[in-house]
């Protein structure tokens, strides 16, 4: 009894220590770069949604958005803090980051006995480096939490744990349906793996039924929204249908394989970084294939295998899909955590002569690839950032971002004063929360081509809002002419040309500015 009590005390102390470490790391990162950088693009997309939820609007129904969970999380914390500004949003995201980092470090610490503090510090540094970009910290943390859910099931596959694991998968899907899909795939593989050479209950069928019931319970917030929130069910299914229409979840980019690095035209630093990025992309696939083969082989031989390795093995390929869906470093960072967690858990149990050189190598590679992308580095000492005020907070941002913010404020003062609406399309959803305005258009981030019916509805919304000015960022995204706004939304573009007057003197030829006629 004493031994069991002592063991529980140790686990509680260990968890508390890791929570303190996780909080310290995130707090230190926030101090370093919380006031640095600002994106009118993706970060603005999240910020607009959080602001609109604070005002009573519903994600997906009232504005284009991610899945609802992250907006309600952000809105609740921002409401508690009495602030709807960008720093309040970043604070809400940072709290979620603490949860993700804690889960990751706790799983690594539990993967072997007597884990050293030095190893956990290195693991924390590696995970924190890859926690980028900050507006995607929900997604990164969810990928870590999914690993934890599967480990929870693998350690003790009881009936209750099948149900609870399913419930967690459903709840994860409230924050992101893609994570729910990845969690479902990983869960099915784990449940099949658990049945190998296993005679006790629950078997695969009963376990699956319990798990599926849990998924329904976990996803209940969205299911209830489809039943109780007027108009939500239609837009929810439309958002799913649209994915099948465009046949993609992202705009693809070529995979930056190591052999595609233009060694003759880049610096040594950039060449090394390019090779490392390509190797990490290969690693996400290679780890998934070899780890699955390893854990299945060990299972057939009835040999023990670390639960973290099993969980990461079956999540690696689903998350590699996300990394490859738009093959840049930002999406690699969101899909790499099964690889990182699997490697860190595997190395933790190795002899010192293998563990330490390997973890230092992983740390160095992560530092080389990721450090230059963090806002704290980009606006650090000697970097050319300028100070601007955004929602009552002083931010250090790149000069072009400051120029864009100044332009939007100038246009609003001249053409849309006293809270009058405006349109900023297709890439600047952050313009609306920046100026505390509601977007006339539902589609605040207009990346994909839309059909005639959709465009006509948007035109009616623009007509009803009577915007004072419209700014069209005429950019061929990824160098693709078909992705210019006039090609993805030709009816809306023609409506603007027919009903608004061009404003001369644009600071950038790509910024097509129109004022109300």
Predicted regions and their residues:
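Extracytoplasmic catalytic/substrate-binding loops of multi-pass membrane glycan-assembly enzymes
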Residues: 34-49, 60-76, 83-87
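Transmembrane-helix motifs of polytopic, lipid-linked glycan transferases
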Residues: 91-113, 148-149
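Hydrophobic, aromatic-rich transmembrane alpha-helices
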Residues: 102-103, 274-303, 341-346
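Loop-to-helix entry region of an early transmembrane alpha helix in multi-pass inner-membrane enzymes
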Residues: 68, 72, 82-102, 274-279
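Short periplasmic/luminal acceptor-recognition loop of GT-C membrane glycosyltransferases, typified by
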Residues: 393-449, 458-463, 467-481, 506-514
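Hydrophobic/aromatic-rich transmembrane helices and adjacent perimembrane loops
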Residues: 181, 324-357
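Membrane-interface helix-loop-helix junctions at transmembrane boundaries of multi-pass membrane enzymes
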Residues: 198-210, 287-313, 324-327
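Membrane-interface alpha helices of multi-pass inner-membrane proteins
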Residues: 126-128, 162-177, 183-188, 217, ...
């Amino acid at each position: 009894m004493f031994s069991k009590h002592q063991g529980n005390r140790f686990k509680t102390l260990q968890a508390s220590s890791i929570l303190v470490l996780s909080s310290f790391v995130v707090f230190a990162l926030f101090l370093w770069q919380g006031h640095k950088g600002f994106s009118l693009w993706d970060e603005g997309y999240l910020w607009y949604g959080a602001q609109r939820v604070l005002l009573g609007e519903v994600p997906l129904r009232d504005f284009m958005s991610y899945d609802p969970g992250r907006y309600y999380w952000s809105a609740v914390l921002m409401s508690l803090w009495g602030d709807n500004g960008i720093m309040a949003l970043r604070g809400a995201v940072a709290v979620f980051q603490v949860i993700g980092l804690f889960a990751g470090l706790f799983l690594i610490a539990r993967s072997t006995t007597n884990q050293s503090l030095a190893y956990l510090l290195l693991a924390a540094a590696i995970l924190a480096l890859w926690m980028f970009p900050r507006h995607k910290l929900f997604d990164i943390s969810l990928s870590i939490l999914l690993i934890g859910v599967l480990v929870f099931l693998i350690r003790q596959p009881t009936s209750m744990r099948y149900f609870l694991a399913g419930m967690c998968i459903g709840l994860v899907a409230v924050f992101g349906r893609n994570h729910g899909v990845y969690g479902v795939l990983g869960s099915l593989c784990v449940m099949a793996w658990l049945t190998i050479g296993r005679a006790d209950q629950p078997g695969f069928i009963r376990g699956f039924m319990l798990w599926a019931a849990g998924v329904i319970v976990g996803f209940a917030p969205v299911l209830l929204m489809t039943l109780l929130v007027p108009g939500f069910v239609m837009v929810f299914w439309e958002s799913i249908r649209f994915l099948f229409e465009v046949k993609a979840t992202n705009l693809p980019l070529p995979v930056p394989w190591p052999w595609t690095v233009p060694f003759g035209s880049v610096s040594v630093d950039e060449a090394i970084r390019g090779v490392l990025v390509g190797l990490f992309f290969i690693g996400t696939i290679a780890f998934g294939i070899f780890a699955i083969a390893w854990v299945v082989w060990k299972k057939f031989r009835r040999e023990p295998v670390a639960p973290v390795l099993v969980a990461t093995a079956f999540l690696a390929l689903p998350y590699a899909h996300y990394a490859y869906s738009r093959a840049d470093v930002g999406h690699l960072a969101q899909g790499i955590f099964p690889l990182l967690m699997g490697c860190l858990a595997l190395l933790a149990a190795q002899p010192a002569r293998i563990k330490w050189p390997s973890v230092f190598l992983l740390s160095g590679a992560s530092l080389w690839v990721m450090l230059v992308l963090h806002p704290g580095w980009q606006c650090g000492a000697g970097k050319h950032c300028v100070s601007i005020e955004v929602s009552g907070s002083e931010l250090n941002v790149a000069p072009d971002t400051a120029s864009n913010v100044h332009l939007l404020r100038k246009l609003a003062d001249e053409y849309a004063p006293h809270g009058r609406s405006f349109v900023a399309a297709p890439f600047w959803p952050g313009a609306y929360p920046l100026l505390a305005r509601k977007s006339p258009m539902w589609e605040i981030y207009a990346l994909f081509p839309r059909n005639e019916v959709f465009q006509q509805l948007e035109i009616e919304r623009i007509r009803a809002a009577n915007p004072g000015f419209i700014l069209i960022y005429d950019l061929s995204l990824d160098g693709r002419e078909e992705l210019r706004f006039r090609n993805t939304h030709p009816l809306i573009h023609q409506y603007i040309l027919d009903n608004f007057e061009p404003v001369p003197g644009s600071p950038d030829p790509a910024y097509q500015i129109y004022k109300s006629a």
